[in-house]
Amino acid sequence: MIRNFTKGLLINNLNINKFGSTKIRPFCSTITKNDKNNVINILKKRGFIHQMTASDIEMIKMTSTNNNNNNDNNNNNNNNKVSLYAGFDPTADSLHIGNLLTLMVMLHFKRHGHNPIALMGGATALIGDPSGKSSDRVMLTEEFIEGNLKHIRENITAVLGEDTLVVNNIEWNKTMDVISFLREVGSYFRVGSMIKKDFIQNRLSDSNENGISFTEFCYSLFQANDFAHLFLKHGCSIQIGGSDQWGNITAGCDLIRKKLKGNAQGITIPLLTNSAGKKLGKSEGNSIWLSPHRTSPYKFYQYWIQVSDEDVERLLKLFTLIPLEEISILVQKHNENPHLRLGQKTIAEHVTRLIHGQKGVEEALNTTELLFGESNKLLTPNASTTKIGDFDIGYLLSRVNFIELERSKFVDNQTEPILNLFAQISDASKSKVKQLLQSKSIYLNNIPVASNSQFIQSSDLIANDFIYLKSGKKIYYLIKFI
């Protein structure tokens, strides 16, 4: 039973019923009646656009579609369908929520009837993108990159759908020799112009002793050639990227204009920051990844639950498909009772469902309920059930941040009482821990620790491996003995 979080709100398809459970609108592959505007206008209103290589009028004209029919099923019937792409270098075995911002832009284009193309940089990852970096990237092996590609593809299709065209630039780069590259690509670029680009200037500045290698200096030429290849083969005329990709994107636009006499444009997305100007996407110093083997659905969900009230409206616009009119009403309701965290819970459920599906949402909600809700009473070795919902309690606990400790040191060892263990993991003094114990403020598996000498016994272990230590409402430690 999921704990009731909110009360009494109905916003079109976003339904918070009187018992508090949230029902999220199903994923919609095409635009709704409330989103009839051009995709560029929608992106600007939602805060996605940092820079564009053409004026608003030109970009709107380029991406205009015939959406005059009120039947949602006909929204893909248009005369001006464009293909656009964004690149994702497989430098890790998962994308992160910074990449998700780019995927959301592509999703908006797709819902407006356009064709997104996801490019996996199997070739460019071997070179290393210098954009936004102060020193050379570590050179990656082909085997490492190949191992990452499968996970990156899964991240992409989770958001954009299995029907999305996903390409790997190793396909056309592996057969191009150096002479052909210099003649067919390099001849269209001038070193003077390349040096003037901001990301090159930053690496060549007096304050940067590392400089830039010739390998990374040529990166933008490879990315430009990717754009030209997609322009020729797939009619791709727009490239999407982060704000640090402006120089690489304009290089591609220039190559298409000079070599192919074509018209191509670029759009950059602002850096993802919170209201305090701090870069979003990390929790306790760790990146928030899209792949469940890197960030579990519970941890992913909790990241969004913990965003500040000041960031709620912006994140609703960026990471959900809720129409803007509904977001305004939702934010108003959120501000009336911010302690209910309606905005954060809406974001968390929408984004978790988008990335991990309904099962991921259920895993996250059940884990949250297990740790903080009424089902917390199940965190005892003698609980009446070993499951919550469809999930085994041991499995849910294994997906939470836990501390690993040596079993032989703390379990069935009378010389290592809970007092010592709690002091070690909390960095509190033993005198402070003694005060907490005397006031019955430390709980082992939801039962107050009885004395300073109480130690952990095998019979205390949940799912054979875990204990749950808690002090107050906000301080808890999940410990796994190995």
UniProtKB/Swiss-Prot annotation:
List ligand-binding residues for L-tyrosine: 85, 129, 219, 223, 226, 245
Q: Where is each S4 RNA-binding domain found?
A: 416-480
Which residues does ATP bind? 89, 282
Task: State where the protein is found.
Answer: Mitochondrion matrix
Question: Which reaction equation describes what this protein catalyses?
Answer: tRNA(Tyr) + L-tyrosine + ATP = L-tyrosyl-tRNA(Tyr) + AMP + diphosphate + H(+)
Q: Which HAMAP family match?
A: Tyr_tRNA_synth_type1
This protein is called what? Probable tyrosine--tRNA ligase, mitochondrial
Q: Which organism is it from?
A: Dictyostelium discoideum (Social amoeba)
Gene that encodes the chain: mtyrS
